[in-house]
């Protein structure tokens, strides 16, 4: 990669030549401060900041000399308002990664210095620390719609989008389907009642089926609907719910609400947000999952259920009436789609996933936002690398379903090879470093005490930033919830989380990870479900017996729950 290409790729706004650094400490410091201030003024209205340090005279034998230079750069950057920027060093110094970590550990700057190393002439650059990039100054905790200004809409629309506890835009833009065909207004909906079934009905028929019409009317009249209970539970604990996220990212479609008929029907059937679980094809059998969403669960479920269960169920489940049914129904919506959520099963193993990407590429719909929930154990299919696809799209967010590290992670998500997961992440950093990646753990009683250690481990390895974690609180199955813990264990968890938050909060400008741990404390203390502990141990031992495992050999801290 040439210097010119780097300027273009990373929107470089200036360079500083370190050959100007001299033995005169004060003179050099004053010079460097002026250079930083000049760059700052030049990019005052920009959303990111990169400072390139030229390699002249920067390759030094003494770690101390290089450290002094870098430390002074950090001090100077702290004197300049860089709250909306990040600083990035490109250097030929082979010790850059080690020294950058030392300097960052001494700094309280929430926007730390980051580094790229190159062996020379800015060729073959490898990422040693993922650059902090807030190019849109995205505010995770804000519920305001991203694509419209609330001051520009009517007072009624403003109320629906920002104040109503019941309104959600999803029923006007979206349908969700399981691999078994059950359809819902979204993936957060409670599982009963179903809103239709794609094995007997088309998506368009479900669109104005009575449950959907009733839900829309409930939302507009401010009535609670049991379908939305999980989002309300999340909001009560302080989590940013799926409902709030829907209004934030899709609230610009509020005009569709005005066209709702008296019976709740909506004539306009154009799905701008997709979340169709094409099948249950998966290579893992996670503890919190089951046969509906994982084909690997089939044999275990047959042993657990016994009787005629195996005769009455199939390994692979598909959402439509045949393998092409869902695809054929979605094609007309390709002109309208703005965002696609890929989950599973395991989406990176599904041909339907790559079929959609191929069609988007063919139509040059690189503006479609791609969001993933993936176990991140496979990143290609039949020679097709998903990394090469992701590089082409304007916005890709990859949430890796990783609950714990090492043996714990392999136990909770059975079939995982932890070394492969870490290698996949390193390859992703090399091939498509600009793609948003975050850990998306399911917080359960099994990983609750270990999650902070896992989080810090990946940050220290340079695989994620501290902010790159999105806690998904497990609500079902209920016997895995963190609120089954007794008071003493909850107190221990809260203490561990409070300590972790002290480390995290100053490094989390997005505030997403911080909210996750804070809300988890609220969530577990809100309810006493200790009566489910017996169920937890019984279900765990049953599965351990089938899989020839023993949970306390892997997660010994759970002995405290006995």
For the regions a language model picked out, list residue spans one by one.
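A short, well-structured beta->alpha microelement
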Residues: 2-3, 32-45, 49-52, 57, ...
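Recognition helices and adjacent regulatory flanks at domain boundaries
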Residues: 237-273, 282-284, 305
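Core AdoMet radical
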Residues: 271-281, 290-322, 335-351, 363-382, ...
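Membrane-interface junctions of multi-pass transporters
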Residues: 161, 191-233
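Radical SAM enzyme [4Fe-4S]-AdoMet core and its adjacent flexible, acidic
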Residues: 56, 82-83, 92-201, 246, ...
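Short, aromatic/basic amphipathic alpha-helical patches
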Residues: 25-39, 63-66, 98-107, 384-389, ...
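Local cysteine-cluster metal-coordination motifs and their immediate loop/turn environment
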Residues: 185-188, 224-235, 281-291
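Structural motif
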Residues: 16-23, 53-56, 62, 89-94, ...
């Amino acid at each position: 990669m040439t210097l010119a290409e780097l300027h273009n790729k990373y929107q470089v706004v200036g360079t500083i030549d370190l050959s100007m650094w001299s033995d005169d400490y004060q003179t050099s410091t004053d010079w460097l401060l002026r250079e930083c201030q000049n760059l700052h003024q030049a990019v005052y209205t920009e959303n990111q900041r990169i400072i390139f340090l030229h390699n002249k005279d920067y390759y030094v034998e003494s770690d101390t000399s290089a450290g002094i230079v870098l430390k002074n750069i950090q001090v100077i950057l702290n004197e300049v308002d860089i709250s909306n920027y990040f600083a990035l060093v490109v250097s030929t110094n082979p010790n850059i990664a080690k020294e950058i970590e030392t300097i960052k550990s001494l700094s309280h700057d929430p926007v730390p210095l980051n580094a790229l190393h190159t062996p020379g002439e800015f060729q073959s650059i490898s990422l040693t620390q993922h650059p902090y990039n807030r190019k849109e100054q995205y505010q995770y905790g804000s519920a305001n719609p991203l694509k419209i200004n609330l001051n520009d809409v009517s007072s009624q629309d403003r109320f629906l989008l920002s104040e109503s506890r019941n309104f959600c835009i999803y029923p006007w833009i979206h349908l969700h389907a399981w691999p078994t065909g059950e359809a819902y207004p979204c993936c957060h909906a409670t599982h009963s009642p179903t809103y239709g079934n794609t094995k007997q009905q088309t998506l368009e028929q479900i669109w104005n089926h009575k449950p959907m019409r009733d839900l829309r009317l409930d939302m507009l009249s401010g009535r609670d609907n049991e379908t939305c209970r999980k989002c309300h539970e999340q909001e009560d604990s302080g989590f940013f719910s799926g409902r709030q996220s829907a209004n934030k990212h899709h609230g610009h479609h509020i005009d569709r609400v005005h066209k709702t008929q008296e019976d709740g029907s909506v004539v306009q059937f154009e799905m701008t947000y997709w979340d169709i679980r094409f099948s249950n094809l998966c290579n893992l059998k996670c503890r919190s999952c089951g046969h509906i969403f994982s084909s690997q669960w089939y044999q275990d479920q047959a042993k657990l259920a016994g009787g005629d269960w195996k005769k009455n169920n199939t390994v692979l489940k598909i959402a439509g009436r045949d393998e092409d049914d869902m695809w054929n129904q979605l094609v007309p919506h390709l002109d309208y789609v703005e965002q696609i959520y890929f989950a599973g099963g395991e989406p990176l193993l599904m041909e339907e996933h790559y079929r959609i990407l191929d069609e988007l590429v063919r139509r040059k719909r690189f503006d479609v936002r791609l969001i993933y929930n993936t176990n991140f154990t496979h990143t290609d299919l039949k020679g097709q690398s998903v990394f090469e696809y992701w590089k082409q799209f304007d916005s890709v967010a990859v949430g890796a379903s990783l609950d714990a590290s090492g043996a714990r992670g392999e136990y909770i998500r059975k079939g995982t090879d932890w070394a492969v997961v870490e290698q996949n992440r390193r390859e992703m950093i090399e091939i498509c470093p600009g793609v948003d990646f975050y850990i998306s753990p399911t917080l359960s009683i099994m990983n609750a005490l270990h999650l902070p250690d896992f989080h810090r481990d990946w940050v220290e390895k340079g695989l994620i930033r501290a902010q790159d974690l999105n806690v998904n609180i497990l609500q079902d199955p209920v016997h895995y919830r963190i609120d089954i813990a007794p008071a003493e264990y909850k107190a221990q968890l809260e203490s561990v989380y409070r300590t972790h938050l002290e480390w995290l909060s100053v490094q989390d400008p997005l505030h997403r990870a911080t909210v996750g741990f804070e809300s988890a404390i609220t969530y577990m203390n809100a309810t006493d479900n200790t009566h489910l502990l017996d169920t937890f141990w019984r279900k765990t031992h049953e599965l351990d017996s089938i899989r020839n495992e023993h949970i306390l050999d892997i997660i010994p801290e759970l002995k405290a729950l006995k």
